[in-house]
Design a protein with these regions (language model features):
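An internal, D/E-rich "acidic patch" concept
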Residues: 54-110
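Short hydrophobic, aromatic-rich alpha-helical segments embedded in or entering the lipid bilayer
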Residues: 40-70, 258-270
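Cytoplasmic-entry segments and transmembrane alpha-helices of multi-pass inner-membrane transporters
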Residues: 1-3, 111-147
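Alpha-helical transmembrane segments of integral membrane proteins
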Residues: 91-124, 171-314
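N-terminal signal-anchor/signal peptide hydrophobic helix marking the start
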Residues: 2-12
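Membrane-water interface segments at transmembrane-helix boundaries in multipass membrane proteins
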Residues: 130-192
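Residue-level signal for discrete positions within transmembrane alpha-helices
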Residues: 8, 90, 94, 130-133, ...
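Hydrophobic alpha-helical transmembrane segments of membrane transport/permease proteins
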Residues: 11-59, 155-175
Length: 314
């Protein structure tokens, strides 16, 4: 467990360094985000000097790293606000969106996998296979744009911008209405992969000899299904946890398309304007959070599967 924790922290810092290098060598400057396009180069250089952007790459990163190790993530170049303050304002929205989508995706994947096995080789099984593997394989970005076009422009039945309407930030139903499309996009865009994993593990469980013996003993089918579900949930949960980082990145993409007030929209805006403190803080935070969810899923998997409890966390 300790090795995994140390490795996760190392990966988090290494990810921030790679991201910093990419931003450093990309075109553009934060100075132009403050409306100085028409100003002289000397004025732009003065702004970059005030922000410390005139220093060499390694020196800039070293300054950020030492501050981050002390818990100081700095302030936004764009707004001048504390990075921690900006993250705190948006993290709840991202958590609600990501958690809601992940739970719905998990339940739907397991349900459809069981339903497909129950009606194996039937018309229902073929429909599930077709929908999952031929329709729901679009990237989140593409599917989100399609949903904006259909539900926001053509039909105009659901909101496609923001996490709530202005003045209705505390209205539960209004916030729920703004969640529908982002959650659906996340679920449908990931359903093909997660359903395939759930089907494989559940079908493998049904093929186990002890399960076949239960059929031979004429045990009630619902009891057999319960045992199969209990047996197959452990690897399914472990896989979901291992996919936390990629799912989180998908959540960020969906937030940016729907202008959802979460960490994702903040991250993409900061990347565009080269707002280093926010980008590095969010990358670091995202990797650590994904590592935490992976670790948590391993614990749940061991609880679900008693045979794994004897294994050490490595």
């Amino acid at each position: 467990m300790l090795k995994r924790l140390v490795f996760s922290i190392f990966i988090a810092f290494f990810s921030t360094f790679l991201c910093f290098v990419l931003l450093y060598f990309s075109k553009g400057s934060i100075a132009y985000a403050n409306g100085v396009n028409s100003q002289s180069k000397e004025f732009v250089q003065r702004i970059e000097q005030n922000l410390g952007l005139d220093k060499p790459l390694l020196e800039q990163y070293k300054i950020w790293l030492f501050k981050a190790l002390k818990g100081d993530l700095g302030v936004s170049f764009l707004s001048g606000e504390s990075v921690l303050k900006l993250i705190k304002e948006r993290i709840f929205n991202t958590f609600i969106l990501g958690f809601s989508a992940l739970m719905l995706l998990f339940l739907l994947s397991v349900f459809l996998a069981l339903l497909g096995y129950s009606y194996k080789e039937s018309f229902i099984d073929k429909i599930i296979t077709f929908l999952a593997f031929n329709f729901f394989t679009l990237p989140p970005f593409v599917l989100a744009l399609l949903f904006v076009l259909v539900f926001g422009i053509f039909w105009k039945i659901l909101p496609v911008m923001g996490s709530s309407d202005i003045g209705f930030e505390d209205d539960f139903l209004n916030r729920l209405e703004h969640l529908i499309l982002p959650v659906l996009v996340l679920v449908l865009s990931h359903l093909a992969l997660f359903l395939r994993i759930a089907r494989n593990f559940i079908n493998e469980s049904f093929s186990q000899i002890f399960i076949q013996n239960l059929y031979a003993r004429a045990l009630r089918e619902k009891d057999i299904y319960f045992l199969v579900l209990k047996y197959s949930l452990s690897p399914i949960v472990a896989y979901f946890g291992g996919s936390a980082l990629s799912f989180m990145m998908g959540t960020y993409v969906v937030e940016s398309v729907f202008a959802y007030k979460g960490l994702g929209s903040l991250l993409f805006k900061s990347i565009i304007f080269k707002d280093y403190p926010i980008v590095l803080a969010l990358i670091f935070f995202s990797v650590l959070l994904a590592a935490f969810f992976t670790f948590l899923s391993d614990i749940v998997a061991r609880i679900l599967n008693p045979r794994l409890r004897r294994l050490d966390f490595v």
